[in-house]
């Protein structure tokens, strides 16, 4: 499903005008990297967060909202990884979203304080 969401990005991107790239925004850099690899030159992909940012409790800025409103698609991980995303998304009028982990069965965390809970880091799941 993760790749399905990214493939959707690519197919939509090819429908964009030849002079203007399809604009995709992601919730964090790992999804942005995957989307860039799928879409290639057909899309302009950027991440709301910067490399190294704490994704779980990120605090979006008004500038983040403004940038996201200019996107044609927003990609989010889901699985409650981005605790801030649903509130953030309420400020975006009509920007389609794809939850890239839809349909993914997460692996359980095997140690530490979250042992036994589902791992929301879907890109790390086998």
Region spans (language model):
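Bacterial N-terminal signal peptides
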Residues: 2-11
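Extracytoplasmic metal-acquisition and chelation regions
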Residues: 14-126
